A protein has these predicted regions:
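N-terminal export/assembly leaders
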Residues: 158, 176-210
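Surface-exposed intrinsically disordered loops and tails
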Residues: 98-103, 198-206, 242-245
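Low-complexity, flexible helical/coil segments
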Residues: 70-72, 166-171, 183-188, 401-405
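Assembly/oligomerization scaffold segments
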Residues: 1-170, 206-227, 232, 260-269, ...
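Acidic, small/polar-enriched beta strand-loop surface segments
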Residues: 2-53, 169, 177, 217-394, ...
Length: 405
Protein backbone atom coordinates (compact mmCIF):
# COMPACT_ATOMS: atom_id res chain seq x y z
CA UNK A 1 0.00 0.00 0.00
CA UNK A 2 1.35 3.42 -0.97
CA UNK A 3 1.62 6.34 1.45
CA UNK A 4 2.22 6.46 5.20
CA UNK A 5 -0.06 4.65 7.65
CA UNK A 6 -2.11 6.73 10.09
CA UNK A 7 -3.45 4.79 13.06
CA UNK A 8 -6.96 3.33 12.52
CA UNK A 9 -7.51 5.52 9.45
CA UNK A 10 -5.63 4.31 6.36
CA UNK A 11 -2.61 5.40 4.35
CA UNK A 12 -1.99 9.06 3.53
CA UNK A 13 0.47 11.25 1.67
CA UNK A 14 1.39 14.91 2.10
CA UNK A 15 3.38 16.28 -0.81
CA UNK A 16 5.11 19.62 -1.37
CA UNK A 17 6.35 20.89 -4.72
CA UNK A 18 10.05 21.66 -4.23
CA UNK A 19 10.52 23.33 -7.61
CA UNK A 20 13.03 20.76 -8.82
CA UNK A 21 12.97 17.04 -9.63
CA UNK A 22 13.02 14.88 -6.49
CA UNK A 23 13.51 11.38 -7.85
CA UNK A 24 16.15 11.79 -10.56
CA UNK A 25 19.10 9.40 -10.79
CA UNK A 26 22.30 11.16 -9.64
CA UNK A 27 25.62 9.73 -10.72
CA UNK A 28 27.98 8.91 -7.82
CA UNK A 29 25.31 9.71 -5.21
CA UNK A 30 25.27 7.16 -2.37
CA UNK A 31 21.47 6.90 -2.43
CA UNK A 32 20.15 8.32 -5.71
CA UNK A 33 23.07 6.90 -7.70
CA UNK A 34 22.55 3.21 -7.00
CA UNK A 35 22.16 1.23 -10.19
CA UNK A 36 18.90 -0.60 -10.87
CA UNK A 37 17.00 1.14 -8.06
CA UNK A 38 13.33 1.89 -8.70
CA UNK A 39 12.99 5.07 -6.61
CA UNK A 40 15.47 7.27 -8.49
CA UNK A 41 15.08 7.09 -12.27
CA UNK A 42 16.68 8.76 -15.26
CA UNK A 43 15.50 12.40 -15.57
CA UNK A 44 13.07 11.88 -12.65
CA UNK A 45 9.28 12.06 -12.68
CA UNK A 46 8.11 14.56 -10.04
CA UNK A 47 8.95 17.80 -8.26
CA UNK A 48 6.85 16.74 -5.26
CA UNK A 49 8.46 15.52 -2.05
CA UNK A 50 6.52 13.42 0.47
CA UNK A 51 6.86 14.87 3.98
CA UNK A 52 4.15 13.06 5.95
CA UNK A 53 6.64 10.94 7.88
CA UNK A 54 7.81 14.14 9.60
CA UNK A 55 4.31 15.47 10.37
CA UNK A 56 2.41 14.94 13.60
CA UNK A 57 -0.87 16.76 12.90
CA UNK A 58 -2.87 18.17 9.97
CA UNK A 59 -5.95 20.39 9.98
CA UNK A 60 -8.10 21.13 6.90
CA UNK A 61 -11.06 23.51 6.65
CA UNK A 62 -13.04 23.92 3.43
CA UNK A 63 -16.39 25.36 2.37
CA UNK A 64 -18.79 27.24 4.62
CA UNK A 65 -20.80 26.47 7.73
CA UNK A 66 -24.17 27.70 6.50
CA UNK A 67 -25.89 28.15 3.15
CA UNK A 68 -26.19 31.89 3.77
CA UNK A 69 -22.43 32.35 4.19
CA UNK A 70 -20.03 33.23 1.39
CA UNK A 71 -17.36 30.71 0.43
CA UNK A 72 -13.83 31.76 1.34
CA UNK A 73 -10.47 30.14 0.70
CA UNK A 74 -10.09 26.64 2.08
CA UNK A 75 -7.13 26.24 4.42
CA UNK A 76 -4.78 23.54 5.62
CA UNK A 77 -2.13 23.70 8.33
CA UNK A 78 0.29 21.08 9.54
CA UNK A 79 3.18 20.81 11.97
CA UNK A 80 6.42 18.99 11.14
CA UNK A 81 8.99 17.76 13.66
CA UNK A 82 12.39 18.67 12.22
CA UNK A 83 14.49 16.04 13.98
CA UNK A 84 17.23 16.13 11.31
CA UNK A 85 17.06 19.85 10.51
CA UNK A 86 16.21 19.19 6.86
CA UNK A 87 13.25 21.61 6.83
CA UNK A 88 15.46 24.52 7.90
CA UNK A 89 15.38 27.06 5.02
CA UNK A 90 19.04 27.93 5.73
CA UNK A 91 20.28 24.34 5.41
CA UNK A 92 21.99 24.09 2.01
CA UNK A 93 22.59 20.37 2.59
CA UNK A 94 18.90 19.59 2.95
CA UNK A 95 17.52 17.20 0.30
CA UNK A 96 14.87 19.86 -0.30
CA UNK A 97 17.38 22.63 -1.03
CA UNK A 98 17.59 23.55 -4.72
CA UNK A 99 21.33 23.88 -5.28
CA UNK A 100 20.90 24.84 -8.93
CA UNK A 101 18.86 27.90 -7.97
CA UNK A 102 20.53 28.38 -4.56
CA UNK A 103 17.20 28.61 -2.76
CA UNK A 104 15.07 26.47 -0.44
CA UNK A 105 12.81 24.03 -2.24
CA UNK A 106 10.25 24.21 0.55
CA UNK A 107 9.11 27.80 0.09
CA UNK A 108 5.94 29.95 0.08
CA UNK A 109 3.60 29.61 -2.93
CA UNK A 110 4.77 26.08 -3.68
CA UNK A 111 2.02 23.59 -4.50
CA UNK A 112 0.90 21.27 -1.72
CA UNK A 113 -1.50 18.34 -1.74
CA UNK A 114 -2.92 15.99 0.89
CA UNK A 115 -4.22 12.60 -0.19
CA UNK A 116 -5.53 9.32 1.18
CA UNK A 117 -5.26 5.90 -0.41
CA UNK A 118 -8.42 3.79 -0.55
CA UNK A 119 -8.49 0.11 0.35
CA UNK A 120 -7.92 -0.54 -3.38
CA UNK A 121 -4.82 1.71 -3.30
CA UNK A 122 -6.57 4.51 -5.25
CA UNK A 123 -5.16 7.94 -4.45
CA UNK A 124 -7.89 10.43 -3.46
CA UNK A 125 -7.05 14.07 -2.78
CA UNK A 126 -8.43 15.72 0.35
CA UNK A 127 -6.83 19.14 -0.22
CA UNK A 128 -4.91 20.82 -3.04
CA UNK A 129 -3.51 24.33 -2.78
CA UNK A 130 -0.43 26.45 -2.18
CA UNK A 131 1.78 27.12 0.81
CA UNK A 132 1.26 30.61 2.20
CA UNK A 133 3.64 30.65 5.14
CA UNK A 134 6.31 28.61 6.93
CA UNK A 135 6.52 29.32 10.65
CA UNK A 136 9.83 27.82 11.84
CA UNK A 137 10.17 27.40 15.60
CA UNK A 138 13.73 26.94 16.88
CA UNK A 139 13.56 25.17 20.24
CA UNK A 140 16.67 25.67 22.35
CA UNK A 141 17.52 22.28 23.80
CA UNK A 142 14.52 20.61 22.13
CA UNK A 143 13.08 19.56 18.80
CA UNK A 144 12.60 22.25 16.17
CA UNK A 145 9.15 22.35 14.58
CA UNK A 146 7.77 23.90 11.42
CA UNK A 147 4.13 24.93 11.15
CA UNK A 148 3.01 25.30 7.54
CA UNK A 149 -0.08 27.31 6.54
CA UNK A 150 -1.72 26.62 3.18
CA UNK A 151 -4.72 27.85 1.18
CA UNK A 152 -6.56 26.63 -1.89
CA UNK A 153 -6.65 28.61 -5.14
CA UNK A 154 -9.32 30.99 -3.84
CA UNK A 155 -6.37 32.59 -2.07
CA UNK A 156 -4.80 33.36 -5.46
CA UNK A 157 -8.06 34.82 -6.78
CA UNK A 158 -8.34 36.96 -3.64
CA UNK A 159 -4.90 38.43 -4.42
CA UNK A 160 -5.83 39.29 -8.04
CA UNK A 161 -7.54 42.47 -9.30
CA UNK A 162 -9.30 43.18 -12.57
CA UNK A 163 -8.69 45.78 -15.22
CA UNK A 164 -11.85 47.58 -16.34
CA UNK A 165 -14.11 44.91 -17.79
CA UNK A 166 -16.98 45.65 -20.20
CA UNK A 167 -19.42 42.80 -19.74
CA UNK A 168 -22.18 41.41 -21.95
CA UNK A 169 -25.63 40.26 -20.87
CA UNK A 170 -25.07 36.55 -20.29
CA UNK A 171 -25.72 33.63 -17.99
CA UNK A 172 -23.93 33.62 -14.65
CA UNK A 173 -21.83 30.62 -15.70
CA UNK A 174 -20.68 32.44 -18.85
CA UNK A 175 -19.67 35.41 -16.67
CA UNK A 176 -17.61 33.16 -14.40
CA UNK A 177 -15.85 31.72 -17.45
CA UNK A 178 -15.26 35.17 -18.93
CA UNK A 179 -13.63 36.41 -15.72
CA UNK A 180 -11.42 33.34 -15.37
CA UNK A 181 -10.33 33.73 -19.01
CA UNK A 182 -9.16 37.34 -18.57
CA UNK A 183 -5.38 37.73 -19.04
CA UNK A 184 -4.95 39.24 -15.58
CA UNK A 185 -6.65 36.16 -14.08
CA UNK A 186 -5.69 33.32 -16.47
CA UNK A 187 -7.18 30.59 -14.29
CA UNK A 188 -6.31 27.15 -15.74
CA UNK A 189 -9.08 25.79 -17.99
CA UNK A 190 -8.40 22.20 -16.95
CA UNK A 191 -9.18 22.87 -13.28
CA UNK A 192 -12.70 24.23 -13.71
CA UNK A 193 -16.05 22.52 -13.15
CA UNK A 194 -18.65 25.09 -14.14
CA UNK A 195 -22.31 24.10 -14.37
CA UNK A 196 -24.67 26.05 -16.63
CA UNK A 197 -26.25 28.86 -14.64
CA UNK A 198 -29.96 29.67 -14.47
CA UNK A 199 -29.73 33.44 -14.03
CA UNK A 200 -28.94 36.14 -16.61
CA UNK A 201 -26.61 38.94 -15.53
CA UNK A 202 -26.73 42.52 -16.76
CA UNK A 203 -24.55 43.87 -19.56
CA UNK A 204 -25.38 47.59 -19.71
CA UNK A 205 -23.08 50.46 -18.72
CA UNK A 206 -24.19 50.15 -15.09
CA UNK A 207 -22.66 46.67 -14.96
CA UNK A 208 -19.17 47.60 -16.22
CA UNK A 209 -16.64 46.20 -13.76
CA UNK A 210 -14.34 49.02 -12.59
CA UNK A 211 -10.59 48.68 -12.60
CA UNK A 212 -9.25 47.40 -9.29
CA UNK A 213 -12.17 45.08 -8.56
CA UNK A 214 -11.12 42.03 -6.59
CA UNK A 215 -11.56 38.82 -8.60
CA UNK A 216 -12.82 36.60 -5.79
CA UNK A 217 -15.12 39.35 -4.55
CA UNK A 218 -16.65 39.78 -8.00
CA UNK A 219 -17.11 36.04 -8.51
CA UNK A 220 -18.84 35.95 -5.13
CA UNK A 221 -21.21 38.66 -6.40
CA UNK A 222 -21.95 36.48 -9.44
CA UNK A 223 -22.74 33.59 -7.13
CA UNK A 224 -24.91 35.84 -4.97
CA UNK A 225 -27.04 36.56 -8.04
CA UNK A 226 -27.18 32.87 -8.98
CA UNK A 227 -27.55 31.57 -5.37
CA UNK A 228 -25.59 28.44 -6.18
CA UNK A 229 -22.21 27.37 -4.87
CA UNK A 230 -18.74 28.64 -5.76
CA UNK A 231 -15.89 26.72 -4.13
CA UNK A 232 -12.66 24.81 -4.64
CA UNK A 233 -13.16 21.05 -4.66
CA UNK A 234 -11.03 18.65 -2.64
CA UNK A 235 -8.93 17.87 -5.74
CA UNK A 236 -8.32 21.52 -6.65
CA UNK A 237 -11.02 22.33 -9.23
CA UNK A 238 -12.97 25.59 -9.16
CA UNK A 239 -16.63 24.52 -8.95
CA UNK A 240 -19.63 26.68 -9.83
CA UNK A 241 -23.08 25.19 -9.18
CA UNK A 242 -26.38 26.59 -10.44
CA UNK A 243 -29.11 27.97 -8.16
CA UNK A 244 -29.88 25.55 -5.37
CA UNK A 245 -33.37 24.08 -5.48
CA UNK A 246 -35.48 21.98 -3.15
CA UNK A 247 -34.34 18.67 -4.64
CA UNK A 248 -31.07 17.18 -3.44
CA UNK A 249 -28.81 14.76 -5.26
CA UNK A 250 -28.91 11.12 -4.07
CA UNK A 251 -27.27 10.58 -0.68
CA UNK A 252 -23.66 9.36 -0.83
CA UNK A 253 -23.49 8.27 2.84
CA UNK A 254 -25.99 7.28 5.54
CA UNK A 255 -24.98 8.09 9.13
CA UNK A 256 -26.94 6.38 11.93
CA UNK A 257 -26.53 6.18 15.70
CA UNK A 258 -28.31 2.83 16.12
CA UNK A 259 -25.48 0.52 15.14
CA UNK A 260 -26.44 0.36 11.47
CA UNK A 261 -24.85 2.08 8.47
CA UNK A 262 -22.03 4.58 9.20
CA UNK A 263 -21.59 5.45 12.91
CA UNK A 264 -20.89 8.96 14.18
CA UNK A 265 -19.88 10.54 17.48
CA UNK A 266 -21.29 14.05 17.24
CA UNK A 267 -24.27 15.86 15.73
CA UNK A 268 -25.34 19.51 15.85
CA UNK A 269 -29.01 20.51 15.95
CA UNK A 270 -30.42 24.00 15.53
CA UNK A 271 -33.87 25.53 15.84
CA UNK A 272 -33.50 29.29 16.01
CA UNK A 273 -35.00 32.60 14.97
CA UNK A 274 -31.87 33.56 13.03
CA UNK A 275 -32.97 31.12 10.32
CA UNK A 276 -35.96 33.28 9.46
CA UNK A 277 -36.06 35.69 6.52
CA UNK A 278 -39.51 37.23 6.09
CA UNK A 279 -38.58 40.34 4.12
CA UNK A 280 -36.13 40.31 1.21
CA UNK A 281 -34.97 43.34 -0.76
CA UNK A 282 -33.00 43.05 -4.01
CA UNK A 283 -31.87 46.04 -6.08
CA UNK A 284 -29.88 45.63 -9.30
CA UNK A 285 -27.06 47.89 -10.43
CA UNK A 286 -28.33 51.01 -12.21
CA UNK A 287 -31.86 50.70 -10.83
CA UNK A 288 -33.64 52.94 -8.33
CA UNK A 289 -36.45 50.44 -7.92
CA UNK A 290 -35.70 47.90 -5.19
CA UNK A 291 -37.75 44.71 -5.41
CA UNK A 292 -39.34 43.61 -2.15
CA UNK A 293 -40.85 40.32 -1.06
CA UNK A 294 -42.70 40.08 2.27
CA UNK A 295 -44.27 37.30 4.30
CA UNK A 296 -46.77 39.07 6.55
CA UNK A 297 -47.70 35.96 8.52
CA UNK A 298 -44.09 35.29 9.44
CA UNK A 299 -43.53 38.94 10.33
CA UNK A 300 -46.46 38.79 12.74
CA UNK A 301 -44.90 35.83 14.56
CA UNK A 302 -41.17 36.53 14.34
CA UNK A 303 -41.00 40.31 13.75
CA UNK A 304 -39.43 41.67 10.57
CA UNK A 305 -36.15 39.98 9.65
CA UNK A 306 -34.65 41.32 6.43
CA UNK A 307 -32.14 40.06 3.85
CA UNK A 308 -30.94 42.87 1.59
CA UNK A 309 -28.87 42.93 -1.62
CA UNK A 310 -28.34 46.45 -2.96
CA UNK A 311 -25.92 45.89 -5.88
CA UNK A 312 -27.19 42.73 -7.55
CA UNK A 313 -25.72 41.73 -10.92
CA UNK A 314 -29.07 40.36 -12.15
CA UNK A 315 -30.17 41.84 -15.47
CA UNK A 316 -33.71 43.01 -14.63
CA UNK A 317 -36.08 44.06 -11.87
CA UNK A 318 -38.18 40.99 -12.64
CA UNK A 319 -35.22 38.70 -11.96
CA UNK A 320 -34.50 40.69 -8.79
CA UNK A 321 -38.07 40.12 -7.57
CA UNK A 322 -37.75 36.41 -8.29
CA UNK A 323 -34.58 36.36 -6.19
CA UNK A 324 -36.28 38.24 -3.36
CA UNK A 325 -39.05 35.64 -3.27
CA UNK A 326 -36.45 32.85 -3.40
CA UNK A 327 -34.66 34.31 -0.37
CA UNK A 328 -37.76 34.19 1.85
CA UNK A 329 -37.50 31.58 4.60
CA UNK A 330 -40.49 32.39 6.78
CA UNK A 331 -40.52 29.51 9.29
CA UNK A 332 -37.64 28.20 11.42
CA UNK A 333 -37.02 24.49 11.08
CA UNK A 334 -35.32 22.11 13.48
CA UNK A 335 -32.51 20.44 11.55
CA UNK A 336 -29.14 18.83 11.85
CA UNK A 337 -26.41 21.38 11.18
CA UNK A 338 -23.25 19.30 11.58
CA UNK A 339 -22.03 15.75 11.94
CA UNK A 340 -18.72 14.42 13.25
CA UNK A 341 -17.19 10.98 13.06
CA UNK A 342 -13.86 9.31 13.74
CA UNK A 343 -12.27 6.88 11.31
CA UNK A 344 -11.48 4.62 14.28
CA UNK A 345 -15.22 3.86 14.47
CA UNK A 346 -15.47 2.88 10.81
CA UNK A 347 -14.85 -0.15 8.66
CA UNK A 348 -12.36 0.05 5.80
CA UNK A 349 -15.17 0.49 3.24
CA UNK A 350 -16.84 3.18 5.38
CA UNK A 351 -13.56 5.08 5.66
CA UNK A 352 -13.23 5.07 1.87
CA UNK A 353 -16.75 6.52 1.56
CA UNK A 354 -16.41 9.15 4.27
CA UNK A 355 -12.98 10.41 3.15
CA UNK A 356 -14.13 11.58 -0.29
CA UNK A 357 -17.40 13.33 0.64
CA UNK A 358 -17.17 16.84 -0.77
CA UNK A 359 -19.02 20.16 -0.63
CA UNK A 360 -22.32 19.84 -2.50
CA UNK A 361 -22.74 16.13 -1.79
CA UNK A 362 -25.86 14.89 0.00
CA UNK A 363 -25.64 12.86 3.21
CA UNK A 364 -28.33 11.29 5.39
CA UNK A 365 -28.24 11.78 9.17
CA UNK A 366 -30.47 9.67 11.40
CA UNK A 367 -30.69 10.09 15.17
CA UNK A 368 -32.64 8.21 17.82
CA UNK A 369 -34.62 10.18 20.41
CA UNK A 370 -36.00 8.65 23.60
CA UNK A 371 -39.11 10.02 25.30
CA UNK A 372 -40.29 7.96 28.25
CA UNK A 373 -40.46 4.37 27.03
CA UNK A 374 -40.70 5.35 23.37
CA UNK A 375 -37.76 5.67 20.98
CA UNK A 376 -38.21 7.44 17.67
CA UNK A 377 -35.77 7.98 14.84
CA UNK A 378 -35.54 11.13 12.74
CA UNK A 379 -33.66 11.06 9.44
CA UNK A 380 -32.85 14.09 7.29
CA UNK A 381 -31.17 14.32 3.91
CA UNK A 382 -28.88 17.35 3.89
CA UNK A 383 -26.36 19.02 1.61
CA UNK A 384 -22.75 19.31 2.73
CA UNK A 385 -21.66 22.96 2.86
CA UNK A 386 -18.36 22.68 4.74
CA UNK A 387 -15.81 20.08 5.80
CA UNK A 388 -13.14 19.95 8.50
CA UNK A 389 -10.51 17.21 8.66
CA UNK A 390 -8.24 16.65 11.66
CA UNK A 391 -5.48 14.07 11.19
CA UNK A 392 -3.10 13.10 13.98
CA UNK A 393 -0.52 10.37 13.44
CA UNK A 394 -1.11 9.08 17.00
CA UNK A 395 -4.89 9.36 17.34
CA UNK A 396 -6.08 9.06 13.73
CA UNK A 397 -8.44 10.93 11.42
CA UNK A 398 -11.68 12.65 12.37
CA UNK A 399 -14.00 14.68 10.15
CA UNK A 400 -16.86 17.14 10.65
CA UNK A 401 -19.44 18.06 7.99
CA UNK A 402 -21.54 21.24 8.09
CA UNK A 403 -24.92 20.88 6.42
CA UNK A 404 -27.91 22.75 5.00
CA UNK A 405 -31.44 21.60 4.08
Amino acid sequence: MAGTAVVASGNYDLEIDTGFVQDAFLLDDAVAGLLDNTQYVLDGTTDFASVLDGVNSISVRRGRRDQGDQFSAGTMSFTMLDTAGIFNPFDENSPYYDTAEAQPGLAPMRRVRLSRYSSLNVKEYLFVGVIVNYDYNFALGGLDTVTVFCADDFYLLAQTYLDEFNVSEELSSARVTAVLDLPEVAFPALTRDIATGTQTLGGSAAFVVPQGTNVLGYLSDVNEAEQGRLFMSRDGDLVFDARLGTTLTPSVADFHDDGTNIPYNGVGITFEADQVTNRAVVQILGSNNPQVADDAGSQAKYFVQTYSITTSLLHSDSAALDLAVYLLDPEPEARYTSLATSFALLSSAQRDTVAVIDVGDTITIEKSFTSGVTTTELAQELAVEGIEHTINVNTGHSVTYYTSP
